């Protein structure tokens, strides 16, 4: 099999995943953490079924060590400087493009022979390396957190706050640290309720979530998220400077949408997404501010006594007699060191950036390539984005097991429909000028139909001069503007008011994406002129004009007899000039999607399980290292769920870990002893920023 470079892979993955007008899908779906350690498949237990025995592998540990661990942001830029203020961060980010952030965690393929996939011990996993003799120095703590993304940072901060002697190891350096998460969804937070947002019954959210997960998700994890995520957000915001929160934290759609609770999406939608953007400020870069916010939370953890070690690549867990008592790392200088701990929380992210793990583990991606007539054994045809899977690998070596399939990727096989810069759901017309699907079944995670369209399928999205009023019926989702942000709304209104008719189009600020890149729209005074601009000719042009007339008749009747669009969309008549269109065509390639959510099984309190579904003492998994958070697809009640869920798992896992240690349950020495929890423990306080924090 051929190797695929990190750069080519992430470019192909992102573009195919998002479609022509949907780069905004990246904005809400973070994966967990930019960190080290772990990933992947099967684990030795009774659950390892009737797969063929592993073939003799030509892949060695040296091969894996040299290839399968991400080196991004690990000293690759000696001139890097950690931003010390939001202004420095915004200047470094430039135009707000997050493609560079997405590179973190990508690794190359090992070129594993086809026959060495789909085994109980796949070649990418191999035998656990024995590294104890290589260790040059050790550290001791009560709680070790591996990975400092949203899940790991939340876990480390709360553990330190609870008086636990905590060390957090992160693979990136402090100067280069980055991640591509952004929108953060929680429910019933004081932050939202104080602004006048509706208070929900958390059991309604829980039930809706489980319906979308098709019963596949761990109900305890989902219930905790539905009932306690608002608490987690308020806790986090209290750690930050109020002026910073007021400037960069936007409570999405808490106002300005009269019909928001009956969105045109054939499913209920819950308000609760906090979006971190530099929007409506003196700079107005529209940059994603969440990575900088995570930096601030890491500094807060240090102030509370947590020791951060940056540039630390996790390699193996220390485990014996079924208990986990620490982990072995390499530092930024290549030295091996060991951290001993009573509890280890693995928050190292997914395996989406590892081509070999992705090909072997992600059923949906592999078979998606096959359905396009492509070689499903070629990593070039199974794209995604994300981390290197090292954390999952570590846990599998220690006896963990992966969740069962189908292990769908986040939005794998889910192409995006075209939309306007202000996002939302609109009538869409195809090559013959006719509508060809139900546009309201286009929630992120539910549009696999578009991915099956042949190359060159025209998708023309149309509205009229009433576009602003129609926006009141739109749920946020990933390709919609945040209507509670007055700056966004007024900027788009200004751009739309300055429209120009004709084939050259005009530019509108694309607030459905990050950065200041505009989107080209087209305007015309008549539908006939709009059809010409969109390339409709002959029968196709007449088909378009007839279909618009038919659409308006169905709107008058309040019922879509053709495709069953949600009734709330039947307000969107196309009758008052000027008329506007956005257009794209399908590329004939499968959408690789975003990160991978499949991971190891836990018991609902984040204790990692063996194949016999018994907890491994001392081992916990959060964020995208924690499996069974979703169904066979990332289909959720609110955009920004991935990042929000990851953060909440870290927040709650810290609580469960403290309870376990207080009750003598753990992998290390203190796990079997009575702990003294009264009074502060002794910490080594650290100064930020440094070359690397050790």
Question: Where in the sequence are the language-model features?
Answer:
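Conserved redox-cofactor binding core of oxidoreductases
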Residues: 75-121, 226-335, 355-356, 548, ...
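Conserved small/polar residues in nucleotide/adenosyl-binding loops
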Residues: 683-690
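An anion/pyrophosphate-binding glycine-rich loop and adjacent beta-alpha core
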Residues: 392-394, 398-536
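Core beta-strand elements of the Rossmann-like FAD/NAD(P) dinucleotide-binding domain
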Residues: 139-141, 334-343
């Amino acid at each position: 099999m051929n190797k695929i470079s990190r750069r080519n892979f992430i470019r192909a993955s992102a573009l195919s995943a998002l479609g022509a007008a949907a780069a905004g899908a990246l904005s809400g779906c973070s994966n967990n953490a930019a960190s080290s350690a772990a990933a992947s498949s099967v684990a030795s237990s009774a659950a390892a079924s009737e797969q063929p025995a592993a073939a003799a592998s030509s892949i060695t540990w040296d091969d894996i060590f040299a290839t399968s661990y991400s080196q991004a942001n690990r000293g690759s830029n000696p001139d890097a400087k950690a931003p010390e203020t939001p202004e420095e961060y915004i200047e470094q980010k430039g135009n707000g493009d997050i493609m560079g952030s997405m590179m973190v965690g990508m690794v190359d393929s090992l070129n594993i022979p086809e026959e060495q996939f789909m085994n109980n011990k796949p070649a990418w996993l191999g035998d656990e390396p024995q590294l104890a003799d290589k260790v040059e120095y050790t550290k001791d703590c009560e709680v070790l957190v591996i990975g400092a993304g949203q899940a790991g940072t939340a876990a480390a901060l709360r553990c330190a706050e609870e008086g636990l002697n905590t060390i957090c190891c992160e693979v990136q350096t402090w100067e280069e640290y980055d991640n591509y998460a952004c929108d953060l969804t929680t429910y019933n937070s004081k932050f939202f309720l104080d602004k006048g947002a509706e208070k929900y019954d958390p059991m309604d959210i829980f039930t809706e979530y489980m319906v979308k997960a098709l019963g596949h998700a761990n109900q305890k994890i989902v219930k905790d998220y539905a009932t306690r995520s608002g608490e987690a957000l308020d806790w986090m915001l209290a750690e930050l400077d109020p002026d910073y929160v007021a400037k960069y934290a936007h409570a999405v759609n808490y106002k300005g949408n009269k019909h928001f609770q009956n969105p045109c999406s054939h499913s209920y939608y819950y308000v609760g997404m906090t979006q971190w953007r530099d929007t409506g400020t003196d700079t107005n870069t529209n940059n994603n501010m969440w990575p900088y916010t995570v930096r601030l939370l890491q500094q807060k953890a240090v102030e509370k006594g947590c020791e951060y070690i940056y540039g630390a690549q996790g390699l193996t867990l220390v485990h014996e007699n079924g208990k986990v008592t620490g982990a072995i790392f390499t530092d930024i200088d290549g030295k091996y060191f060991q951290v001993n701990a009573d509890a280890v929380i693995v928050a190292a992210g997914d395996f989406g950036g590892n081509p070999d793990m992705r090909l072997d583990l992600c059923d949906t991606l592999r078979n998606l390539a096959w359905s396009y007539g492509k070689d499903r054994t070629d990593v070039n045809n199974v794209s995604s984005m994300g981390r290197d899977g090292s954390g999952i690998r570590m846990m599998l070596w220690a006896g963990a097991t992966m969740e069962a399939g189908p292990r769908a990727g986040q939005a794998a096989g889910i192409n995006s429909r075209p939309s306007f810069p202000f996002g939302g759901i609109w009538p869409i017309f195809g090559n013959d000028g006719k509508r060809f699907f139900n546009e309201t079944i286009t929630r992120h995670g539910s549009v696999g139909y578009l991915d099956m369209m042949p190359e060159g399928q025209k998708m023309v999205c149309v509205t009229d001069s009433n576009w602003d009023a129609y926006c009141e019926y739109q749920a946020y989702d990933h390709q919609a503007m945040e209507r509670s942000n007055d700056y966004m709304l007024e900027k788009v209104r200004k751009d739309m008011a300055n429209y120009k008719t004709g084939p050259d189009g005009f530019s509108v600020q694309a607030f459905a994406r990050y950065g200041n890149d505009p989107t080209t729209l087209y305007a015309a005074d008549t539908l006939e002129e709009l059809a010409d601009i969109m390339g409709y000719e002959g029968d196709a042009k007449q088909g378009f004009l007839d279909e618009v007339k038919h659409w308006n008749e169905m709107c008058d009747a309040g019922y879509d007899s053709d495709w069953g669009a949600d009734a709330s969309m039947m307000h969107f008549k196309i009758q008052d000039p000027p008329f506007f269109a956005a257009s794209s065509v399908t590329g004939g390639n499968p959408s690789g999607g975003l990160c991978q959510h499949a991971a190891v099984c836990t018991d609902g309190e984040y204790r990692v399980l063996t194949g016999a579904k018994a907890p491994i003492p001392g081992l916990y998994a959060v964020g995208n290292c924690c499996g069974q958070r979703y169904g066979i697809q990332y289909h959720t009640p609110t955009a920004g769920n991935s990042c929000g869920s990851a953060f909440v798992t870290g927040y709650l896992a810290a609580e469960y870990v403290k309870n376990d240690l207080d009750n003598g349950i753990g992998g290390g020495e203190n796990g079997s002893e009575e702990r003294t929890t009264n009074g502060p423990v002794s910490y080594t306080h650290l100064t930020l920023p440094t070359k690397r924090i050790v």
